């Protein structure tokens, strides 16, 4: 027999530790333009005032005008997050500082 534990929330320090782990583990990004994926460095990663973790990528003047996807990679090489995107760089004069945010939310885990 197994008894399921009560809901025991993580401490604020534990949540901060998870955020720091996320900030350390992202190595680079890729963007999709047409059928091609192009590697791009991470511009910066930080914790926002509201507690979300933000990963920033800079699409400068060398990036194509239409960006249709973005992927983030873990420092160990595996795909960490990614999906479709719809960025039109023509709308911006110099480039785009793209921000991907993560919000860590606790729940009991019971269905």
What positions do the PLM features span?
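Small cysteine-rich, disulfide-bonded extracellular modules of the LU/uPAR three-finger superfamily
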Residues: 1-69, 75-111
């Amino acid at each position: 027999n197994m008894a399921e534990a009560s809901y025991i929330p993580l401490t604020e320090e534990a949540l901060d530790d998870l955020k720091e782990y996320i900030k350390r583990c992202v190595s680079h990004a890729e963007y999709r333009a047409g059928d091609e994926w192009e590697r791009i460095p991470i511009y910066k990663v930080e914790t926002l005032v509201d507690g979300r973790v933000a990963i920033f990528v800079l699409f400068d003047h060398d990036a194509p005008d239409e960006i249709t996807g973005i992927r983030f990679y873990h420092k160990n090489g595996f795909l960490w997050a990614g999906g479709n995107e719809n960025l039109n760089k023509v709308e911006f004069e110099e480039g785009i500082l793209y921000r991907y945010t993560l919000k860590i939310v606790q729940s009991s885990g019971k269905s």
